[in-house]
Regions:
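Long, charged, low-complexity intrinsically disordered regions
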Residues: 1-80
Length: 80
């Protein structure tokens, strides 16, 4: 498994996106240290805001980092 994973939630609803990210976090093995969530930004900030708010205090997430573009958010994972 890669140490870095990418998840594209562009065309998802907020509920679908949260479900997909939660599943990705559950599947993330010991070698995964970062999940890049691609939420986009041209269609609004609902997904971006939901990702950043929900996962800022998630037990598996060490910190949130801004991605390389405004349409990405990186979840840096804790070593559990």
């Amino acid at each position: 498994m890669n140490a870095f994973q990418e998840l594209d939630i562009h065309d998802m609803t907020k509920v679908q996106a949260i479900t997909a990210i939660d599943a990705c976090l559950r599947r993330a093995g010991a070698g995964v240290y970062r999940i890049r969530v691609i939420h986009g930004y041209h269609g609004g900030t609902v997904l971006r805001d939901a990702v950043r708010a929900r996962y800022a205090s998630h037990p598996k997430v060490k910190r949130i980092e801004l991605g390389l573009t405004p349409g990405e958010t990186d979840l840096v994972l804790r070593e559990l």
